[in-house]
């Protein structure tokens, strides 16, 4: 057999450790970054929304807030401080948090309270509406909040609009709760901004480019716009026919322009219907559906209301004030443009209403020129949405893992909200929601929460976030999860919910602190921070590997006692092979911790010690009970277990020598189990597999009490899990359950169940499930099997049990990737579902062949073969419940372990064995599998067979072995479970070697009996054990007979000689399965304890069993494996000569420790540690060496094989880390994008706020502005004009600085204000400054425009006059650059025009760089393209633009601006010289 290279293994383990450490550090950093970003996002969003509300107040300039107060409030908002709620509310924070949480989750109550407040004329209803949006629903950043708010709006339609006498008037007034909330929601909805920008940006920019005239369609108003002299010049003499005719011509011309403009808007509206926000569409369709049912409302009126909501409340405000929505950012909108936009908005609304109401007769003529259904069709699309009950989510939820756990609310808002609710309660408007509100208010403290005085004195600049802000479980990220992300997975509790500081309090000079009040949700698990064991366990449970260790509570992070268990080493277990796995798992990657003691400490922490003590105590008591029972039935004698019997004698080379009385003979089962385990071991002798059975048993311990006792605090704590559970009750219950369970299918693996959830085991779990995942004994084989069926037998099991169901629903369910294993699982399903063995048989085949060669230790084929044979035993023997129980306890392995094993077993079973001795070997191999596994296999494989198969065959074949085993059992019986040898698992040599082995062992070991020697206490114990086992077996036999059809099927299974073997194995499997089931529970039941004690020596490592106390043997293997993994993953490989291994009688010689490869490796490492004076490492290595020295070479090879197998099985953990990292990176990127959006919104609101303030300032200076314009007209020299403009701007800047409104402005605001003043002033004098020579300039521009138009017809990108390099022609004709320069007319100040030119040049350079990434484009490449772009775009007034900028901005040009300006003027000059005729 191939030898496992310890150096390679160490290398891989070290790489794994380094990778895992770095990934964990990165994940920790990412978690911190995500939290910081989320916190910043929520705080910024809270402030931004308050600024927007403040802006609305400024625009309305209501009596309550003067512009100066709004400005002061804006400044205060920027300095908002966020403080944990308890600092002001003290212990009452919890009550308020619960109140807010329950209120938030009751949209109906909120809606009815707001309506009731309006009916009662509560003056603070509006501020409460703001609080609901900004605080309770956190500005709807999270989809959960958005969904709640949509429900509130739906209830408001029902309670407010539906009940109103004139809902349309109520809606148009815009002061009802629905209107305010809808406005807040639609303004903040990002998808709404996207829709508005996509729809309106282009048409509005085109309108600004052509804004020369008011598009007035009312003749009377048209005339009023001109002074008398202008009227006469334009229309002729007033009152004449010519005058009226000219006026009519102008009106028609304006109408034609307006129709073209509006059609452009409608076209964009239709084109972008696809991106209309789903949530708004849902609200509109809900309104239509709800109000259509009202008898007094006609359909036309309902439709008109939907039109009002859609156009008057959503689209038209954005058309009229695009700057406020960020649709237009840098192009100022002058008076003419604003008027034209208002005309467009008015026409859109009228067009939407065509057919539903008679329009203004004056507009009929213009409306007649439109397609009647143009806007109505858009409305139909929106209303036509199916009115489903649940609100849609606005977009793909990239923040799935995030959830809000706090509310941001100021103290005054909180008090206002509570008082509002109390006043609503006292009023009589609530109807059926009264009770709900009463319950909510009942829990609030009667008095107002007091502000702590300290708060007022200390400003909290950096209030802490409440704990809620932590990324929570991203469990779905487990590699195993099929879903890339389940909602819970990423649960990141961002507590930052920006709740608003009360909008109304503007007078305060100190910023009002915003309280961060926790909603009371518990802290969640952080993505990527699950331990290795948890991840691996989770995979098992979700993957359906019989192992269902993690209960749903655990998945959700709820505390549960089962948690402790599953935490132990389960993780790895599940994933890693089996028993050994468990042990491995213990040391799981957490090894990182590098301190051994940390390894075990999972949630269970110190449970280990207590558990051990408990176990010992219980063991003692139960032992007595078992002894009593056994004595009653004289089981020992029946089993033929005599103290002196030498094992070697018992073993006969053939199975059939002894005739067993009947299948029901208790000893048969036990013996068989043992035999099988032994046989498996034999076959595997050579294999690296770790101790055959021992591994499993050990694992069991993890789950079960067995191990836990043995477990040392430092290394094995993890293993203890189930032990810590209260022993007595559980055991009793479980035993009862087992008894009541019928058949394999129905019996549930207690361990499994328990781990799955804290409830008592459910019969539904099939034994099989327990079996599969863990056998470490045959790592290779198993691995292969596992790879084939990673979920091992238990696959469906998990589904069957209720617990599993829960788990599957759990957000964290991980499903292992589909693999052959799934098919295997499917085959095994029947077991889980109680259907009986028959279905099970199919899978055998799969197990036979490993899916891929084992990476490390190869496994003997023999080990794999023989599955079939095994199973049958089961059947013929029909284990009684008692037997099963005993067996189970003997091997108590966690189901998980069993699972993987079973796969191994199954594989071994598969091979038919014709020759008894050959059969025997497979049996041994099987034995090597953890018995649990064997069991699992059996149950899985067993199919109904004729029950005729002769017990005698079985018995004869295995009797001798069985006898031997029974002796062992005997000795085992009296020992505390931890001392027992784990018989079934113990590997045995192939039969031919068996006797020799025995003899040698006898020589070497203390007692005649190999097992007894293992336990170190020979015979006396055997009899007690035998009795106990028999007793238990009997008990269960009867139960099985009574209850389990599947057992019957199994019994039938053994029909052939091969079956004999099968029977053994199946029995074995069954037992072990049972054991596994029992294992999870600590042995409290007396029978159970005894059974636990039955753990047989076979389960122990060979050398350990011979040399050490049984107690040590059971534990030492796992312990050694854990420590060895730690040593290997921290070692630097040092080469040393390959050792030769001498073998004696076909067995590795374990007498010469110096031959042990591991020991030699460790010695080198110790030498290095001494050399480096690394005391910690020295201590760890020496302790590891002490543990390893006890084992013989064969066991050491098994140890390495087991570690290698565990290494392979940890792949899902690596995948989990990778997915968590990717998920966190995605979340972080999305949060940053959200933050960008919020910051942009805030910037837009602040700029518009500044613009409104400037407008107010300029209105107060209107007289001065008129004087300035008159003076400007009189000037002729360009320099004088420039100087005059500069002087007047400086005058206005000074006036602004002295204005009370601007006292609190920041430097940035002042700069924005100066820019706004410049734009406003230049807008007023634009025509005078742009066309100083008036008509002469206009005509000159027209000539150039026509010249360029002709050029554009003949000039192409590859025209020889341009000489554009060929490499750049692929991006021609550079449309984005053309569109940039075409908008230059929309900008009125020379600065803005230069910026427009700069953007065009930058766009061209970007496109050129894109075309040729190898070189940077230079001026020779750039200028020809610029010329071509100008020819194709042909912007109006090119010459006047050049003159305007040169006159008013030339002195300000510098740097980049100056360079691009020079290129631009050169291109214009060049264009002038091109002759289009040539």
From Swiss-Prot:
GO terms for molecular function: cadherin binding; GTPase activating protein binding; GTPase activator activity; guanyl-nucleotide exchange factor activity; small GTPase binding. Residues 778-789, 889-902, 954-975, 997-1008 have a biased composition (Basic and acidic residues). GO terms for cellular component: cytosol; endocytic vesicle; endosome; plasma membrane. The record marks 172 as: Arginine finger. Residues 147-385 form the Ras-GAP domain. Residues 574-608, 739-820, 846-874, 889-1023, 1043-1064 are annotated as: Disordered. InterPro entries: DUF5601 (IPR041545), RasGAP_dom (IPR001936), Rho_GTPase_activation_prot (IPR008936), VPS9 (IPR003123), Vps9-like (IPR045046), VPS9_dom_sf (IPR037191). Expressed in erythrocytes (at protein level). This is GTPase-activating protein and VPS9 domain-containing protein 1. The modification Phosphotyrosine is found at residue 460. Keywords: Endocytosis, Endosome, GTPase activation, Guanine-nucleotide releasing factor, Membrane, Phosphoprotein. PANTHER family: GTPASE-ACTIVATING PROTEIN AND VPS9 DOMAIN-CONTAINING PROTEIN 1 (PTHR23101:SF25), RAB GDP/GTP EXCHANGE FACTOR (PTHR23101). The gene is GAPVD1. The keyword Transmembrane helix does not apply. The lineage of its organism: Eukaryota, Metazoa, Chordata, Craniata, Vertebrata. It comes from Homo sapiens. GO terms for biological process: endocytosis; regulation of protein transport. Residues 1338-1478 form the VPS9 domain. Belongs to the GAPVD1 family. Pfam families: DUF5601, RasGAP, VPS9. The modification Phosphothreonine is found at residues 390, 458, 470, 762. It comes from the Eukaryota. Acts both as a GTPase-activating protein (GAP) and a guanine nucleotide exchange factor (GEF), and participates in various processes such as endocytosis, insulin receptor internalization or LC2A4/GLUT4 trafficking. Acts as a GEF for the Ras-related protein RAB31 by exchanging bound GDP for free GTP, leading to regulate LC2A4/GLUT4 trafficking. In the absence of insulin, it maintains RAB31 in an active state and promotes a futile cycle between LC2A4/GLUT4 storage vesicles and early endosomes, retaining LC2A4/GLUT4 inside the cells. It is found in: Membrane; Endosome. Residues 578-588, 758-777, 1012-1023 have a biased composition (Polar residues). It is a peripheral membrane protein.
